Amino acid sequence: MNYTIYDYLGLFFLYAFLGWLLETTVAAVRKKHMVNRGFLNGPLCAIYGITAVFMTRYLYELQSSPVFLFLGCMIIATAAEWIAGHVLERIGHGKWWDYSNKKWNMDGYICLQYSVLWGILGVLALKFGNILGLTLLHLAPNGVMHITLWILFGAVSYTHLRAH
């Protein structure tokens, strides 16, 4: 399938929001109060959006092979999580998550348990989430969708650059 820049932007915002929702919900249940798990201003967890776009771009040809698709999603998500963990520790001056107490962890940033989970979520996203997300995105007239995506992109970029 040929994706446009607008498809990729739409998928980025969709998965960044869903990732934020997942992270915030899990943290709120564990801590029994609201915790904003986003790194960007607003309800977004960029690692989810970036990883989903990367998977969409580079794993499309594996759609017909569930095992290889799962392995590809697992590898990409795990690599993204490991890199993001180190980057966020350097620029955020602290660990945003710590899997040190989990079996088969590396640097406390990745572990086999979550790598398998990311692989499963990646397969679900590529098999079902992208279709649903892009169908909803394309319900809006092209001009409205394009302007909205660029405004969102500009707002996130501006607030991120101002914060750093």
Task: For each feature predicted by the language model, list its residue ranges.
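Functional transmembrane or membrane-interface alpha-helices that line membrane-embedded catalytic
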Residues: 3, 30-67, 88-130
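Membrane-water interface of alpha-helical transmembrane segments
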Residues: 3-10, 68, 108, 112, ...
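Hydrophobic, lipid-facing residues on alpha-helical transmembrane segments of integral membrane proteins
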Residues: 9-25, 46-54, 58, 71-83, ...
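Membrane-interface starts of transmembrane alpha-helices
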Residues: 40, 64-76, 141
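Membrane-interface helix termini and inter-helical loops of multi-pass transporters
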Residues: 131-140
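Conserved small/polar residues in nucleotide/adenosyl-binding loops
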Residues: 159-164
